Amino acid sequence: MAMHAKATPPQIPDTRRELSELVKRKQELAETLVNLERQIYAFEGSYLEDTQMYGNIIRGWDRYLTNQKNSNSKTDRRNRKFKEAERLFSKSSVTSVAAVCALGGIPDHMNEKREPGSGTESDTSPDLQNQENEPSQEDTEEADGALQDLKPQKAASTSSGSHHSSHKKRKNKNRHRFDMKMNKKPRADYSA
């Protein structure tokens, strides 16, 4: 009694069909993500414009009680302007920049600071960590005139150094700029 049982070969999945379905699904999800990022960008912009005069979650609510509504619509429009740096929610997403750039929402100068292929600026960049330690634009403009004589020397001294700079060096640099503004000459203990 020989039983011949037909051995059925195991089902081989159609990997090409499965791959094409996954690629389509990925494209659909990418489109959905782009639309969500655009909506967040638009809602955030309208929120920042509407709440600029009185306060918002980004700048705080200090002006809510002190600011009274002006009847002058021209002043109202001028006060509704806000900085791109205040777009906290849009900038918190890695994919937001690509989605909003497709709309033309973020100016080109905002994209220049980004590393190619990264999508966002690194959270560990010195610019983000020491933003409060950096002098304001007015301070640097005033100090630039006094520092023009020192710039060639500074460039020569730092050109042989490594590309990595420490927090302490930046702190001393800011102190040096402040001394230049106040005293118009650097203190001996800060120059290196």
From Swiss-Prot:
Composition bias type Basic and acidic residues, residue spans: 177-192
Coiled coil residues, start to end: 11-45
Keywords assigned by UniProt, alphabetized: Activator, Centromere, Chromatin regulator, Chromosome, Coiled coil, Kinetochore, Nucleus, Transcription, Transcription regulation
Assigned GO CC terms: kinetochore; MOZ/MORF histone acetyltransferase complex; NuA4 histone acetyltransferase complex; nucleolus
Residue numbers spanned by region Disordered: 106-192
UniProt subcellular location: Nucleus, Nucleolus; Chromosome, Centromere, Kinetochore
UniProt cross-references to Pfam families, sorted A to Z: NuA4
GO biological process, one term: chromatin remodeling
InterPro entries for the chain: Eaf6
Comp. bias (Basic residues): 164-176
Cystine residue pairs: none
Biased composition (Polar residues): 119-134
PANTHER family recorded: CHROMATIN MODIFICATION-RELATED PROTEIN MEAF6
Similarity remark: Belongs to the EAF6 family.
Subunit structure: Component of the NuA4 histone acetyltransferase complex. Component of the hbo1 complex. Component of the moz/morf complex.
Role: Component of the NuA4 histone acetyltransferase complex which is involved in transcriptional activation of select genes principally by acetylation of nucleosomal histone H4 and H2A. This modification may both alter nucleosome - DNA interactions and promote interaction of the modified histones with other proteins which positively regulate transcription. Component of HBO1 complexes, which specifically mediate acetylation of histone H3 at 'Lys-14' (H3K14ac), and have reduced activity toward histone H4. Component of the MOZ/MORF complex which has a histone H3 acetyltransferase activity.
Protein name as annotated: Chromatin modification-related protein MEAF6
